[in-house]
Amino acid sequence: MLKSSSLYAAIDLGSNSFHMLVVREIAGSIQVLSRVKRKVRLAAGLNKENELSEQAMERGWQCLRLFSEYLRDIPAEQIRVVATATLRIAKNADIFVAKASEILGNTVHVISGEEEARLIYRGVAHTTGGAEQRLVVDIGGGSTELVTGTGAKTTQLMSLSMGCVTWLERYFSDRSLTEENFAQAQQAAKAILAPVAEKLIQQGWQVCVGASGTVQALQEIMIAQGMDELITLPKLERLKQKAIECGKLEELEIEGLTFERALVFPSGLAILIAIFETLHIENMILAGGALREGLVYGMLHLPIEQDIRQRTLRNIQRRFQIDIEQAHRVQQLAEHFFIQVSKSWQLDNRCRELLSSACALHEIGLSVDFRQAPSHASYLVSHLDLPGYTPAQRRLIASFLRNQKGIIDLAPLNQQNALPINQAYRLVRLLRLAIIFASRRRDDTLPALRLRTEDEKLIITLPHQWIAEHPLRAENLHEEIQLQSYVHWPLMLEEQNNSRIG
């Protein structure tokens, strides 16, 4: 049975949905136990005088009655409940908040837009990799937060009065998806962005991170359609045209777009296009967390690590009792191989990091069983929470682990969208070779070998007489030559006297 003192809960009463996150603290990290989301559309219940309707408030209270059961075994001081844009502006918010606090047995805090932006940034900083300057964009139901910062430190916090629910009611109220409706929605968003745009552009950023349901929906669409994970303006424009072709909200069908997200997708899309155009954003990635994660990490008082991925890898290695020395051995060899072929094979630093991550986790499948360990490894990584990695990167690493040895299955490599397929193929080849050469699990048995490429042909130069002195690994290498040939990956061995041996 879980000790109640290890449980934490964060509840976000948003303008579109109410969310609850329940986690357990484990050795300085969090394990997600439950995520509950209910579409309440509170903002849709605001009238022209900014008063919430009784029906909208009842929808919210009913949702909180459901949430309250989860909270009974969690200490009150380990629960944070916040309300955002709609309850900031509703004239009768006090009525809703009083009853909501009573239902939950915990105070509901209506937070300012700036505080919301700060919490969103904290959630992103704790869960999304990279030490670069960031621009974080979160399109909510009633407001949009824009935050710049580096590491744990924010430099600008902005909360703007536009959201996917309010824009739905204002610019798509007839439920028509027309050029005119989109143009009006985008123009209105640009007008709100105009006073802050220059300041944000001058501040600058190296990576743009999206932390909202709209961005999550875009990721799901791109995955379903086999696109890479980077969100760009041309992709947004293509999706807008597809929406316009559907004509009506009720008839909106885009591959990968769920029914649940469809209603507010066009309005969120219009706001996002306006943000891209106004701020000249080249591309955007999906955040690993936002407001609720910011609340949880705030209660835990955990420092923000610069290298979130390393923390994630350490935690998983510890949890699954992975042989860290062997993982490091394979990492070192793979790094050695990577350096030698990266230029000719056009492999960048992003490739290097993902290859290293796969090396760190390659033996995770042994925690289930030796037989079919690569399949077990792939399954585990596909379903584990990996802070610092995007969903596409997680799928890529899983595809690497599936193909770390044995017969090569190209399907998962072809289906991932984190890297170009040729780069994924090349990294798998390096991983497989590093595992073979490190198979004796001793540092003093690693050969001083060289790799070079001729287009897709990979040539390994071994020390003189190495093959004769290491018959088991030599046999594994000859088998590997055969396995790679089945998928048209030429692999050749030679010894330093230039004699070709395979």
Curated annotation (Swiss-Prot):
It comes from the Bacteria. It is an enzyme of class 3 (hydrolase). Keywords: Hydrolase. One of its GO terms (molecular function) is guanosine-5'-triphosphate,3'-diphosphate diphosphatase activity. Its EC number is 3.6.1.40. Pathway: Purine metabolism; ppGpp biosynthesis; ppGpp from GTP: step 2/2. InterPro entries: ATPase_NBD (IPR043129), GppA/Ppx_hydrolase (IPR050273), Guo-5TP_3DP_PyrP (IPR023709), Ppx_GppA_C (IPR048950), Ppx_GppA_N (IPR003695), PyroPPase_GppA_Ppx (IPR030673). GO terms for biological process: guanosine pentaphosphate catabolic process; guanosine tetraphosphate biosynthetic process; nucleobase-containing small molecule interconversion. It catalyses: guanosine 3'-diphosphate 5'-triphosphate + H2O = guanosine 3',5'-bis(diphosphate) + phosphate + H(+). Pfam families: Ppx-GppA (PF02541), Ppx-GppA_III (PF21447). Belongs to the GppA/Ppx family. GppA subfamily. Catalyzes the conversion of pppGpp to ppGpp. Guanosine pentaphosphate (pppGpp) is a cytoplasmic signaling molecule which together with ppGpp controls the 'stringent response', an adaptive process that allows bacteria to respond to amino acid starvation, resulting in the coordinated regulation of numerous cellular activities. NCBIfam families: PRK11031.1 (NF008260). This is Guanosine-5'-triphosphate,3'-diphosphate pyrophosphatase. It comes from Proteus mirabilis (strain HI4320). The gene is gppA.
